[in-house]
């Protein structure tokens, strides 16, 4: 098999045996990019020169007999809303087309420290607002399983890169499903860790109480290794949880006997595609055969998650995005009459339609006459949704649902129907409102398109999710499936 198709732990074994070099892996990934990038379009910026320098440094360590970490020399792609010092960071927006950060995000620094090789910055929905990567200010990204379909979003470039062999691992961000939904649509593993477990320092903010950085990987073992690298307290992030470091590989036991898993009936309702439902039921059957006790449960406030999310997230976005004014960095329209006109023109030309729509929604819900009726009420609903999860986890080790109600849809199919697009995240949004961890892993193909299964867990209990996901993966073939491009 080609090097670009292997997992990080398989490549690590070959590296430590000196059967391949880190530079071999990097070259294999860039050769793959040359083959398929014109079709998939995962990237906004490639960093080949820096990548080759880093790969050679890893090879020098190996030659000197130094021990290397499990992810040393492994190519990783970074979503373009994480600051990378000296490397353009655009958030896929025209308003940041020329922004080069003077510092790197903590997660990026941790990746560098682990001797991973950054391949480039991936495409996304502008400012992480969207579910298809069609809202990018630069170009569309295509699903490697069917180039006429979307990869999901907002981290569509990161998911597509891993699925297409253009990176071994990638980082994305998840505000309402932006890691898990594209992971499901592209047939890879994606995780949104607990809010506060991974530093947000250097992540360009969309909705600060919901945003969370997380990985895309080929399998669950790689996921555990990446979490070992990126999780942990960061004094630069005031919302970072001060927890002791966990070795997540200890949870890869292939044993779920006696575990209790709940399936909320609200997540299996009418909007779920029948083929998706069929694959989820097959996975439930497999988990039962492996010794888990799986039963239906109820999360009564689920229906209110979507409206609450689109009030809270847009309110926070309207505040966060006020900083893009043409004065300090990014796009500045020169032919303005005065300062106010420059603000208006820079923002109206720099932001895309979806970003403008969400800024207007958020500004409206925060305005004096509507604050109590909308924003405050949404915060109360958020509390009710969190209480639903708290009650469920008194009884269950984890909850299970589809990740996305459908498989990947055609490019352009939902562009003119924002409500239909928003409903793509109906199964993922409640997790962000509650701040808990969730993982999406492949559970089969429907019409040769991947279907994703979501596991949701207690806050800071990523280990249980990895344990269940690893057991399911070890007893099925789904994470070993690769698209033909």
Curated annotation (Swiss-Prot):
<dbReference type="InterPro" id="IPR036928">
    <property type="entry name" value="AS_sf"/>
</dbReference>
<keyword id="KW-0547">Nucleotide-binding</keyword>
<keyword id="KW-0067">ATP-binding</keyword>
<dbReference type="GO" id="GO:0050567">
    <property type="term" value="F:glutaminyl-tRNA synthase (glutamine-hydrolyzing) activity"/>
</dbReference>
<dbReference type="InterPro" id="IPR004412">
    <property type="entry name" value="GatA"/>
</dbReference>
<keyword id="KW-0436">Ligase</keyword>
<feature type="active site" description="Charge relay system">
    <location>
        <position position="79"/>
    </location>
</feature>
<feature type="active site" description="Charge relay system">
    <location>
        <position position="154"/>
    </location>
</feature>
<dbReference type="InterPro" id="IPR023631">
    <property type="entry name" value="Amidase_dom"/>
</dbReference>
<protein>
    <recommendedName>
        <fullName>Glutamyl-tRNA(Gln) amidotransferase subunit A</fullName>
        <ecNumber>6.3.5.7</ecNumber>
    </recommendedName>
</protein>
<comment type="subunit">
    <text>Heterotrimer of A, B and C subunits.</text>
</comment>
<keyword id="KW-0648">Protein biosynthesis</keyword>
<dbReference type="GO" id="GO:0006412">
    <property type="term" value="P:translation"/>
</dbReference>
<dbReference type="GO" id="GO:0005524">
    <property type="term" value="F:ATP binding"/>
</dbReference>
<dbReference type="InterPro" id="IPR000120">
    <property type="entry name" value="Amidase"/>
</dbReference>
<comment type="similarity">
    <text>Belongs to the amidase family. GatA subfamily.</text>
</comment>
<feature type="active site" description="Acyl-ester intermediate">
    <location>
        <position position="178"/>
    </location>
</feature>
<dbReference type="GO" id="GO:0030956">
    <property type="term" value="C:glutamyl-tRNA(Gln) amidotransferase complex"/>
</dbReference>
<dbReference type="InterPro" id="IPR020556">
    <property type="entry name" value="Amidase_CS"/>
</dbReference>
<dbReference type="Pfam" id="PF01425">
    <property type="entry name" value="Amidase"/>
</dbReference>
<comment type="function">
    <text>Allows the formation of correctly charged Gln-tRNA(Gln) through the transamidation of misacylated Glu-tRNA(Gln) in organisms which lack glutaminyl-tRNA synthetase. The reaction takes place in the presence of glutamine and ATP through an activated gamma-phospho-Glu-tRNA(Gln).</text>
</comment>
